[in-house]
Amino acid sequence: EIHFLKLHPSLVREIHLRQVNQMAVRSLVGGCANTQARVIAVGVESGDEWKMLRHLGVHAGQGPWFADPEPLNLPD
């Protein structure tokens, strides 16, 4: 069973300008429609990208648009 489907940053980059990428994401989101899977966009860099991704049905996102990466602090 698939719980999460993460979209590669190359698919997300400038998606608001790329119709082929929009069709691919729409298809992937549609394929997950009757499942428990949540679609997550990785590498979201702008509000325009995020707006389009939400319009296409993407559930969540991560990337510089939301927060800058932080270093991983491991216990000693």
Task: Give the predicted meaning of each segment.
Residues 1-76:
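EAL-family c-di-GMP phosphodiesterase catalytic domain
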